[in-house]
Each structure stands twice: as structure tokens, then as C-alpha cells.
């Protein structure tokens, strides 16, 4: 059990925190990789897709006019688990079709929905910060196994606000949330992200869900949202 006092807002990570790493790596990533080629070719000139392909060409140094080169770059980034904004945006577009077609539902750990509702009832605002695009974040919660959880959240942040291991990203989030940093709690399974948030003066807690997670000793850690005792300001 870990206790946190004076909390006005909670910012939560997704992968390894609200949702299993295996869902992302064994369901979502392969689905996007499988459908990337057809999606890019079918939507090559669509404005929303073209905007992201411009960035893929710029960041990857590949020929913007070549679907083959762009697709190869995107698939390479997926294989390397790169947190690159245009890749995440395009993955989100592909994942949406999977949700719409019922290919899968967004995984959330069993206690997550109840705890999120409880914190909202306490008057605490909830936010998401993930390397996945805002659209993908809304999908995993909007099409979750526990139903549509998006009404519980007040906002979403992705890599457009900055990298998750950069303290300035958390400072930017605090400005958007419009609460004192010390009244904002950040939840993540990744020690480097917790360190960056703590540097920005947020309260932090690590989620250690099962084996294979690097446990750090600097900050509080719990195995489940049910182990968090959060008292609002």
C-alpha cells in the first residue's frame, strides 16, 4: 500500500500501468504491422495520412514519393519499438479499424476501471500520458474490456508534449493541468519516467505488475491500483 495526500490530478501511463505490455506488443503492434502496407497504399493521398507520411520521410530520410520506402521505414520503426510521433499516429489509425471490426478490445487490468471511477468521485481529475498517440489512447479506453472509460478522463498527452523521460514534458503537462506540481500524481512502470516526473516536482508511484519489471527503490511502488490510497486536496 502507498499513500498520497493532497492530490488534485492523476496522470497515468498506459503500457504496464493500466494495461498489459503483452496486449500492446502481442496484439496491437502485430496488427499494425500486418495491415501497414495495405493501409498506406490505400490511403497514400488522404490528407491525414499524407501529413504523417511527410514526417516519416523527413525523420527517416526516405523518398516521400515511394510507398515502398515509407512502408519499410515504418515497419523498421515498429520492429525497433521506436516512439516516433508519425508512426504512433499511423498505428492509431490502423488500430481504430481493428477496434471497429471487433478484432480485439482494449485491455485494462481488473481493478483499473473501478479505481478510476472512485478517484473521479473524490473530485480528482484524471489524465493519460503515453507514447501512443492521443487517438490510440482514446481507443484503448473507449473500446476497453470494461466498457467506454473515456468519460472519466479530463485530457490526454502524447509525444507532442515531449519525451516521457524528459522533465520538461511533465512541466508542460502541469501547466496544461493548471494545478501545482506537488498535487499531481504520476503513475508508470518505468523508473526513468518516474525520475523525470519527480524532477518536475510531481508525486510519483511505480506500478510493478508481475515479473520482469525493473523495481526501483527511490519512489513508492505498488502491484495494483487497488494498493494506492489517494487522498484529495
Swiss-Prot record:
Cofactor(s), names only, from the UniProt record: Mg(2+)
GO biological-process terms attached to the record: L-methionine salvage from methylthioadenosine
Pfam families hit by this protein: Hydrolase (PF00702)
Its EC number(s): 3.1.3.77
Keyword Magnesium: yes
Keyword field: Amino-acid biosynthesis, Hydrolase, Magnesium, Metal-binding, Methionine biosynthesis
GO molecular function, one term: acireductone synthase activity
Keyword Amino-acid biosynthesis tagged: yes
Cofactor note: Binds 1 Mg(2+) ion per subunit.
Gene3D superfamilies referenced in this protein's UniProt entry, alphabetically: 1.10.720.60, HAD superfamily/HAD-like (3.40.50.1000)
Function text: Bifunctional enzyme that catalyzes the enolization of 2,3-diketo-5-methylthiopentyl-1-phosphate (DK-MTP-1-P) into the intermediate 2-hydroxy-3-keto-5-methylthiopentenyl-1-phosphate (HK-MTPenyl-1-P), which is then dephosphorylated to form the acireductone 1,2-dihydroxy-3-keto-5-methylthiopentene (DHK-MTPene).
Protein name: Enolase-phosphatase E1
Amino acid at each position: 500500500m502507498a499513500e498520497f495526500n493532497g492530490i488534485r490530478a492523476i496522470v497515468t501511463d498506459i503500457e504496464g500501468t493500466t494495461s498489459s505490455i503483452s496486449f500492446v506488443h502481442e496484439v496491437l503492434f502485430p496488427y499494425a504491422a500486418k495491415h501497414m502496407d495495405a493501409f498506406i497504399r490505400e490511403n497514400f493521398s488522404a490528407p491525414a495520412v499524407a501529413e504523417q507520411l511527410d514526417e516519416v520521410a523527413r525523420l527517416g530520410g526516405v523518398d516521400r514519393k515511394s510507398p515502398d520506402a515509407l512502408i519499410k521505414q515504418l515497419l523498421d520503426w515498429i520492429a525497433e519499438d521506436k516512439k516516433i510521433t508519425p508512426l504512433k499516429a499511423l498505428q492509431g489509425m490502423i488500430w481504430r479499424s481493428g477496434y471497429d471490426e471487433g478484432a480485439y478490445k482494449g485491455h485494462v487490468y481488473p481493478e483499473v476501471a473501478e479505481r478510476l471511477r472512485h478517484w473521479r468521485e473524490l473530485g480528482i481529475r484524471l489524465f493519460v500520458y503515453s507514447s501512443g498517440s492521443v487517438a490510440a489512447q482514446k481507443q484503448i479506453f473507449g473500446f476497453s474490456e470494461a466498457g467506454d472509460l473515456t468519460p472519466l478522463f479530463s485530457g490526454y498527452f502524447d509525444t507532442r508534449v515531449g519525451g516521457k523521460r524528459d522533465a520538461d514534458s511533465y512541466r508542460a503537462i502541469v501547466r496544461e493541468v493548471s494545478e501545482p506540481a506537488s498535487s499531481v500524481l504520476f503513475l508508470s512502470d518505468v523508473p526513468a519516467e518516474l525520475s523525470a516526473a519527480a524532477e518536475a516536482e510531481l508525486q510519483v508511484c511505480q506500478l510493478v505488475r508481475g515479473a520482469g519489471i525493473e523495481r526501483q527503490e527511490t519512489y513508492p511502488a505498488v502491484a495494483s491500483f487497488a494498493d494506492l490510497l489517494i487522498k484529495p486536496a
